[in-house]
Amino acid sequence: MPHPLLPDLETLASATAAGKGYKLCCVQVFTHLIPMTIQVQIRRKDGSDVSLDDCAHFSASMDEALEASQLFTEAYVLEISSPGIGDQLHSDQDFLTFRGFPVEISFRDHDSDLHQAGLLHKRSDEHVHINIKGRIQRIPRKAVTCVRLTNPTG
């Protein structure tokens, strides 16, 4: 059953996207997650690719619009993406932009390929830091083979 506020949320997201040069693709509300997750997918009006920076900028605008609308009184996580957007983080800006987002880190440890999932905390010169159930784990950058955004909804 769709969330009762989904039509209002779609209207708000569509207006916010249009004002920033994007068009709305999809809005989903996942109430089974704690906190609730609101996923918004956007595309550029001109058809060009949406970058990670575009998602971050739109996230700020959408968050302001949500707060001003007072549609939701409970806590929520806002996720902005685009169909087909690249999910690997490479640049320092990527790591700053997606601080706090769910990630999976692939790395090598003593000839084994390992994976850790958590919330991106930061990347320093020596380590990638992720929050796993409230504890910060440091993974040496030399060992990291890939850091990619994940979707907490599965």
UniProtKB/Swiss-Prot annotation:
GO biological-process terms attached to the record: ribosomal small subunit assembly; translation
Localization annotation: Cytoplasm
Entry's family note: Belongs to the RimP family.
InterPro entries: Ribosome_maturation_RimP, RimP_N, RimP_N_sf
GO cellular component terms given for this protein: cytosol
Annotated function: Required for maturation of 30S ribosomal subunits.
Keywords: Cytoplasm, Ribosome biogenesis
Keyword Membrane among UniProt keywords: no
Pfam families, per the entry: RimP_N
KW Protein biosynthesis (keyword) present: no
Full protein name: Ribosome maturation factor RimP
Gene name, Swiss-Prot/TrEMBL: rimP
NCBIfam families according to UniProt: PRK14634.1 (NF011227)
